[in-house]
Amino acid sequence: MHKLKLKILPNQYSIHRLKDKNVIASLLKRNNIFFSFTSTNEETSLICDSKIKILNSDKDDNWSCIQLIGQLKIEETGIWSRITTVCADSGCAVLTVTTFNTDYFLVKTSD
């Protein structure tokens, strides 16, 4: 298994439980920002920069986002296990986000 390279994204992030999905259209117009939108039968969630004001949502603030540099092969195993074990051992909550080419994880920085 190769050594992981990480990049800490510069802003703080919030996790929102949305009551209105229309907010996504305005985020799509912004350039060069990280956000993640997930919708299921149970809820719709958004992770975005804490400076972006989202109305009509429940939110959890104070998350830092870290990007894994380089593409990970789909068949590569144990990477998330290594990362989440380190976080768990230090008492840190972690959330992972995977896109087609890039992987991210968010860690709770404070309450």
Q: Where does each model-flagged region fall?
A:
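A cross-kingdom feature marking solvent-exposed beta-strand/loop segments within repeated
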Residues: 77-78, 89-105, 111
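Helix N-cap/beta->alpha junction signal
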Residues: 50, 108-109
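Regulatory modules associated with amino-acid/nitrogen control
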Residues: 1-90
